[in-house]
UniProtKB/Swiss-Prot annotation:
Localization per Swiss-Prot or TrEMBL: Cytoplasm
Residues annotated for ATP binding in this entry: 117-123
Highest rank taxon of the organism: Bacteria
Protein name (database record): UDP-N-acetylmuramate--L-alanine ligase
A family per Pfam: Mur_ligase
High-level lineage: Bacteria, Bacillati, Actinomycetota, Actinomycetes, Kitasatosporales
Keywords from the UniProt entry: ATP-binding, Cell cycle, Cell division, Cell shape, Cell wall biogenesis/degradation, Cytoplasm, Ligase, Nucleotide-binding, Peptidoglycan synthesis
Gene behind the chain: murC
GO cellular component terms attached to this protein's record: cytoplasm
EC number: 6.3.2.8
Family statement drawn from the similarity comment of this UniProt entry: Belongs to the MurCDEF family.
GO biological process: cell division; cell wall organization; peptidoglycan biosynthetic process; regulation of cell shape
C-alpha cells in the first residue's frame, strides 16, 4: 500500500462503486494494491474498468455481497441507511468510512489541490490533471467525470501532486487539507442541505480554513459570491484572485472564440500569456485560468503550464460532441443548475452563430426544481426550442406539486418555444423530427438524459 494509507483500507468494500466519486477512489486504491470489492445497481463501463484493475464488482445490493473479512465499507451521502450491505456491515462490526474520508486518506503525504465551487469543479480538476500529466509531473487525481483523454476519472500517479474535486453539497470538503484550494464560484444550490447563503458562506469559510499553513486560496474575482467570500476571509489565508476584473491578481485580458475552442490572454506576475483552450465558452476559459493560477501557486511555471492546458479536450457530458447525422450535431451537457445552463447555452451560441439550438432538458432533483424551476425555464429561453422531460429524482422522493411543469410555465413566460414530454423514450424521435440540417441539439441535465444523444443520432440517420 502507498505511504500514509491506513491499513483499514487494504480490503475496502464500496457500496455504489460505480458512482463518479466512488469509482475514482476505488480505482486509486486498486492501483495502490488494495483488494477492492463493491456493488452497484447495474452493469457499466465503469464496473468493467474496475474489474480490469482486479476489483470484484457485484451487481445489485445484497448482504451476501459484503465479505466478512472486509477491512471497511466505503459509502457516499447518497447511500440510504437501510441498504442491506450497510446493515450487514453494522452486524459484522466492520467500520464504515465516508467517501470523503477515504479521499482525504489518499491525499495524505502529498501536495493536494482541492477544487471547489458550485459549478465547474469537474472541468477545472480535469484541466489540471491533463496539463500536469502533459508536463510529466505524474499527478494523482480524482475527478467527478470521465476524461476524453487519458480516459479515466482517477489515477494513482508517481508524482507528489494530488488533484481532487472538493464537494460542498454535503460539506464533505471540510475533510481535506489542501496546499492549494480553488473556489470557482459560490451559489446556493443544494437546498436540502443548505437553508441560506449565510450557511453556504460559513461552509466555504470552513473549507478555506483547512488550507495548510503557507498554502494558497485561488478564487474568482468576477463572481459576487466568491468576492463576498474573499471579503469574509480577508487576512486569514493567502489569496490569489483571477478573472476579468481590473483588480484580479491573474487578470484575463481577452477570451476570443475560435469555433469550438477559445484563445485566452492573461497577465500573471507581470507577464502576458496567450494560450488555447480546446473547449468553447467563456466559463471554460475562466476554469482554465483558475487551473493556471493553482499550478503557479504550487510552483509550476505558468509559461509551461499554459500551453499544456491545450491538451485538455473535454470531459464526458461537459459539452461533449456525441456525433453528427443528417447535418445535425448532437452535444451532451451536464448542466442542471440555471447558471450552468445559461453558460453552456451562451457557449454554444458563440460557437454556432445563427444556427438553431434545440435542447432536450431533463430536470435533476425535486428540491432543485422546487427552488430554481423558474430560473431553469428562463435559461431555456436562450435556446430556439426546447423539450422538457420529467424530473430525474436521483436520491430524492417526490415533493407534492413539484413537477417539470414549473419549468415549462416559466420558459413560456420568458417567451421560449418549449414542449413538455412525459414519455422519455418517445423524445429522441420527437427531437430528431424537429431538427433540420445545420441545427445543434443539446441533451442537457445530470440524469440519464445523456443516454438519449445516441438515440437521437440513430433517429436522424433513418
Amino acid at each position: 500500500m502507498a505511504p500514509g494509507l491506513p491499513t483499514a483500507m487494504d480490503r475496502p468494500h464500496f457500496i455504489g462503486i460505480g458512482g463518479a466519486g466512488m469509482s475514482g477512489i476505488a480505482k486509486i486504491l486498486a492501483q495502490r494494491g488494495a483488494e477492492v470489492a463493491g456493488s452497484d445497481a447495474k452493469e457499466s463501463a465503469t464496473a468493467d474498468a474496475l474489474r480490469a484493475l482486479g476489483a470484484t464488482v457485484h451487481i445489485g445490493h445484497a448482504a451476501e455481497h459484503l465479505a466478512a473479512d472486509a477491512s471497511c465499507v466505503v459509502v457516499s451521502s447518497a447511500i440510504r441507511e437501510d441498504n442491506p450491505e450497510l446493515v450487514r456491515a453494522a452486524e459484522l462490526g466492520i467500520p464504515v468510512v465516508h467517501r470523503s474520508d477515504a479521499l482525504a486518506a489518499l491525499m495524505n503525504g502529498l501536495r493536494p489541490i482541492a477544487v471547489a465551487g458550485t459549478h465547474g469543479k469537474t472541468t477545472t480538476t480535469s484541466m489540471l490533471a491533463v496539463s500536469l500529466s502533459e508536463l510529466d509531473l505524474g499527478p494523482s487525481y480524482a475527478i467527478g467525470g470521465d476524461l476524453d483523454a487519458p480516459g479515466s476519472n482517477a489515477l494513482h500517479g508517481e508524482g507528489e501532486i494530488f488533484v481532487a474535486e472538493a464537494d460542498e453539497s454535503d460539506r464533505s470538503f471540510h475533510k481535506y487539507a489542501p496546499e492549494v484550494a480553488i473556489v470557482l464560484n459560490v451559489e446556493l444550490d443544494h437546498h436540502a442541505n443548505y437553508a441560506s447563503m449565510d450557511e453556504i458562506y460559513e461552509s466555504f469559510e470552513t473549507f478555506a480554513g483547512k488550507i495548510v499553513p503557507g498554502g494558497t486560496l485561488v478564487i474568482a474575482a468576477d463572481h459576487e459570491g466568491a468576492r463576498e467570500l474573499t471579503r469574509r476571509l480577508a487576512g486569514r489565508v493567502r489569496t490569489v484572485t483571477y478573472g476579468e476584473s481590473e483588480d484580479a491578481d491573474v487578470r484575463i485580458l481577452s477570451v476570443v472564440p475560435q469555433g469550438l475552442k477559445s484563445e485566452v490572454t492573461v497577465v500573471l506576475d507581470g507577464a502576458e500569456l496567450t494560450f488555447a483552450v480546446s473547449v468553447p465558452g467563456r466559463h471554460y476559459a475562466h476554469n482554465a485560468v483558475a487551473a493556471l493560477a493553482a499550478g503557479a501557486a504550487l510552483g509550476v511555471p505558468a509559461a509551461e503550464l499554459a500551453p499544456a492546458l491545450a491538451a485538455y479536450t473535454g470531459v464526458k457530458r461537459r459539452l461533449q460532441l456525441k456525433g453528427e447525422a443528417a447535418g445535425v450535431q448532437v452535444v451532451d451537457s451536464y448542466a442542471h443548475h440555471p447558471t450552468e445552463m445559461t453558460a453552456d447555452l451562451e457557449a454554444m451560441r458563440a460557437a454556432v452563430g445563427d444556427a438553431r439550438i434545440l435542447v432536450l432538458f431533463q430536470p435533476h432533483l425535486f428540491s432543485r426544481t422546487q427552488e430554481l424551476g423558474k430560473e431553469m425555464g428562463q435559461a431555456l429561453a436562450l435556446a430556439d426550442a426546447s423539450v422538457v422531460l420529467d424530473i430525474y429524482p436521483a436520491r430524492e422522493d417526490p415533493i407534492p406539486g413539484v413537477t417539470s411543469e414549473l419549468i415549462v410555465e416559466a420558459a413560456r413566460a420568458a417567451g421560449a418555444d418549449v414542449t413538455p414530454v412525459h414519455d422519455k423514450d418517445a423524445s429522441p424521435a420527437l427531437v430528431a423530427g424537429m431538427a433540420k440540417a445545420g441545427d445543434l441539439v443539446l441533451t442537457m441535465g445530470a440524469g440519464d438524459v445523456t443516454d438519449l444523444g445516441p438515440r437521437i443520432l440513430d433517429e436522424l440517420s433513418k
